[in-house]
Amino acid sequence: KRVSVKIIGESASRRLQLSRGDLDIADSLPVDQLSALKQEGKVAVAEYPSLRVTYLYLNNSKAPLNQVDLRRAISWATDYQGMVKGILSGNGKQMRGPIPEGMWGFDATAMQYSFDEAKAKAALEKVKDKPASLTFLYSDNDPNWEPIALSTQASLGKIGINVKLEKLANATMRDRVGKGDYDIAIGNWSPDFADPYMFMNYWFESDKKGLPGNRSFYENKEVDSLLQAALKTTDQAERTKDYQQAQK
């Protein structure tokens, strides 16, 4: 059979054409539109666990986010549960460490940030070079990215960090992220195969900085050693130990 792929920028247009029967499959619809499609009863809306994640890049390679206490302040100020409930209508779960739940190597005891304004302000007090503002890059590639950007802007505003939102064409955003020309940016990630390598090595190895995966430009020699050790054995228990140690 002949397969035709259409590029339709507006999610509302994708949803309308799907409802009318003009499309057989539509991708990247907001959760509220999925709920409306369910109620219409014309389209099958399937729900299943996913290893797809959405995360923010905090640029470790340049000021001011090369300061760990500033990154901690942002992490404590983020309203994770508010995003899950308000933006995703509960159809998601906050990550606990880089390896998603459901994949071997997941650490149920890994440290997890939560929204805590007091801890965010305490971390910010330790920052020597406090930023006048930070820029948040996003595109219309995912309809959830803009509300996540707005939520982040509001949350950080409460602790005195001004966030400027910059919406770009997705290709332009990727180019900026690849060059490290940003403060905060957003992205989605789905593994090519179900192995922690796709999250740990891609995201954190020093030699994968930029678009290859380490888009936060993180660098840590001890972490590099543990990640490389995890690739030198086929023993899953040993690999799990290395990956979990790298997260500490």
Q: What are these model-predicted stretches?
A:
Residues 14-15, 23, 34, 70, ...:
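Short, hydrophobic alpha-helical packing/hinge segments within bilobed ligand-binding/sensory domains
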Residues 125-191, 236:
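Ligand/substrate-recognition segments at binding pockets and active sites
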Residues 11, 27-33, 51, 80, ...:
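Beta->alpha turn/N-cap motifs
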Residues 35-47, 179-182, 195-212:
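Ligand-binding "clamshell"
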Residues 66-154, 219, 225-226, 245:
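Append "and occasionally in soluble cytosolic enzymes with long acidic Gly/Pro-rich linkers
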Residues 2, 7, 49-63, 138-140, ...:
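Well-structured core secondary-structure elements of compact alpha/beta domains
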